[in-house]
Structure formats: C-alpha cells, structure tokens
C-alpha cells in the first residue's frame, strides 16, 4: 500500500505520533501531507498529544503520554525511536530508563522500570521491561524506604532516588542497578533530618560524573548545594562537598524544583513551577520559572516559554548527543533458519 492509498484518518493518526522535530521534514513528502499541516483541525489534534513524563538516560529520552497509552524511547541525535507497549492505562505509574552492560558480551542494553503504590498504599509494586523484547516482568522487591518521586536522575546507567526511611523518615538516597534488578545500599545525604524538616530538596547530575543535591530546611531561606565525588561502576562510598550556599527568599519554595550547578562559576540554574494568582481574572494558575543565582544571591529571571502540559513539573537535564543504537524487537527465529 502506498501513502496515497492511506485514509485521511489514518494519516492524521500517524502524524500525531511523529516526534515534533521530524514533522517539518514530512511536509515535503506530498501535497496531501502538506495540506494536513495547514489544516487547523489537524494542528489542534497534534497539540493535544501531551507528554506527562520524560526521563533521560545515556542520551536517550523516554516519553510517556498523558494517559499512559504511548511510550517511546527516542535518540534525538540518531533520529531513532522505539515504541513500547504499556501494560495498562494507569496514570499513577512512574517510569524510568536505565542501562547495564553484559559481562560476557560487553554489550550495553536498556530496561524500563515501572512502579506504583499498591491499592493499600503501603507498598511499591515494580515491573521491568527489556527494551528489545517489550515483555514486562513483575519484580519481587521488598524495601524499608519510600521513594521521593519528584527527585530521581540517571547516572552511569543507574537510577538514583532521594528516599526516606519508613521508620524514622530520614531523607537518604538509593540507586537501582539494572544488571541485578535490585536497589543498592543506603547512601546518606550530607546531613540527616526527617523528610518533614525540609522545605526544598532536589537531585541533579553534574557533567555526567557526579550527583548534586539542593537542601533547604523549613523556617529558613538558606539553601545549600552539595556535590559528590566522581561516580563510576566501582564507586562504593560517596563523599559530599558543599559548593554553594545561597540565602535568598525569592526562589526554592515551589514544588518540582529542578536545577543545574556550575562548580567553577559557583552558579545555579533553576527551573520550578510556581502557583500564581492573577488579580484581574481571579484565576490561580501554575507558571514555569527559570532563573540563575550566584554567590552574590542575585536572582536573574530568564525568558521561558510556558509548557503545554500544566500538570507536568519542569524537568531539566544535561544532554550530550549519543551514538547509542536503540534496541529493536528481536525477530523470532523460524524453523529452518
């Protein structure tokens, strides 16, 4: 079947699933496709394809749409995509992407980890999917800690979460190893306080080598940014160094804070979603804010387009173009092959 034989409904469905960066190239495919881009109805349909979750690992991006019906792993640099079939439509799930290297073949493979609280709300349920197979498996994991969902990052293939102990509620950090499909040992933060003692806490990656954490206790505007030693596959113990202390009440109180830190320039770039009240309309809305703060505590706000996904917290990460080839489904061997 040729493109000209496809129905308009099917064409519109295809275009709604194409990454935005590729849409411009498709306009020159034929007159019909170009006319679809001009059609306001189709353009509005494209805008309705919202992204609810994004996660970054090794130059690959994992996208989940607003109703958990579309899951895509994308390498923007290589222009490759891999569509993965979600196992259920449930917006309470969280998804992360990680990698591991096979000891014998030295080949790097990728897995998607999905988790959510069970109906009783006291236990996390985990499922994992090999990217090459799209086959989901249930993991038997028992933990004595809870995940701080708003703060998880990927480094060297592992996923790191801020966590809090179920008994004393102290904030710590744990990582998930995709080779063993298990959580590692507890990694203490620079200082220990119960989760409720923190006004703001956020996790970040520094130059794909280190982890960084922003900490602010309740009742104070003082914020500290700490950075770990370099992390590799053999790192067993983390040591923390404080690189920046800020004392400014103009930022850091909003949920979903995401940040970068420049160790040399002693400067931090922050993204956060803030609740704003418009006097003229009496409407309360969420707006994304982007700003830099340095040792002088001066806040410089930057221009930033508002997101089409009001429910999604700002998520910022350092992206380095990757030559990683996305694994595609392996063909089942036929008899006689």
From Swiss-Prot:
It comes from the Eukaryota. Residues 1-46 form the F-box domain. SMART domains: FBOX (SM00256). Pfam families: F-box, FBA_1. PROSITE patterns: FBOX. InterPro entries: F-box-assoc_dom_typ1, F-box-assoc_interact_dom, F-box-like_dom_sf, F-box_dom, Gal_Oxase/kelch_b-propeller, SCF_F-box_component. PANTHER family: BNACNNG10540D PROTEIN, F-BOX PROTEIN CPR30-LIKE. NCBIfam families: F_box_assoc_1. This is Putative F-box protein At4g09870. It comes from Arabidopsis thaliana (Mouse-ear cress).
